[in-house]
């Protein structure tokens, strides 16, 4: 991203974008306390400031940078103007002031950010591996299981719930093996909620919702499921 502004407003906009970019990273990481700024001491001759957003808990030595935020001043447009012969000054229509816009540049890498998101979320516990992704970025928000796949009445109700939820959320379906293995399979891919339809569900119209991180189980009314998931994703 390149943000063009008045030279006198560079400080304001540099700090603005520095804050905005860090806030975005913190909004998607599981442990935002693992993020920080690195201020460059050696700068290009045209630069006044340069910061990197880093994953400070990285085990990769110096490979911590996810995004750079740079004060480029008027260097880019001045050089373009010099070599192209084009006047790239901006004229303020209200004041008539003429100036070369200054540039705040932010540049990030998707591959390294993805790597650090995985490192930040990965956990090995005594009896399971769990990817504790921020629910906002989990590939699936929920998974629906019939307690027993060979019971048509359970499968029918579970499939109905699955069809309803997938309208608004990325939802997985799994009826393989036993329920414990299904839970752990979803833990490994970071699914925040597992929803189990059991025999009680046929009577009380409620399902068991298991949270990925706490493994706590709650009974939630079927007609309240969508709102429950939405609330916990906010």
State where each predicted segment sits.
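NTP/phosphate- and nucleic-acid-binding module
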Residues: 2-234
């Amino acid at each position: 991203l390149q943000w063009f502004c008045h030279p006198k407003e560079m400080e304001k906009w540099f700090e603005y974008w520095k804050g905005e970019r860090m806030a975005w990273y913190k909004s998607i990481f599981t442990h935002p306390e693992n993020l920080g700024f690195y201020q460059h001491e050696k700068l290009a001759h045209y630069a006044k400031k340069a910061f990197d957003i880093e994953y400070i808990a990285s085990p990769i030595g110096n490979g911590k940078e996810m995004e750079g935020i740079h004060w480029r001043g008027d260097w880019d447009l001045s050089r373009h103007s010099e070599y192209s012969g084009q006047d790239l000054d901006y004229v303020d229509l209200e004041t008539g002031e003429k100036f070369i816009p200054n540039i705040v540049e932010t540049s990030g890498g998707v591959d390294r950010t993805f790597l650090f998101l995985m490192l930040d979320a990965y956990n090995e516990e005594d009896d399971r591996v769990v990817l504790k992704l921020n629910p906002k970025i989990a590939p699936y928000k929920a998974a629906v299981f019939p307690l027993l796949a060979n019971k048509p009445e359970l499968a029918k109700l579970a499939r109905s719930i699955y069809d309803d939820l997938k309208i608004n959320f990325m939802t997985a379906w799994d009826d393989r093996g036993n329920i414990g293995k299904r839970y752990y399979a979803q833990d490994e891919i970071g699914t925040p909620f597992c929803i189990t339809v059991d025999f009680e569900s046929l009577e009380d119209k409620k399902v068991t919702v298991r949270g990925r991180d706490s493994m706590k189980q709650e009974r939630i009314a079927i007609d309240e499921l969508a709102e429950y998931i939405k609330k916990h994703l906010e």
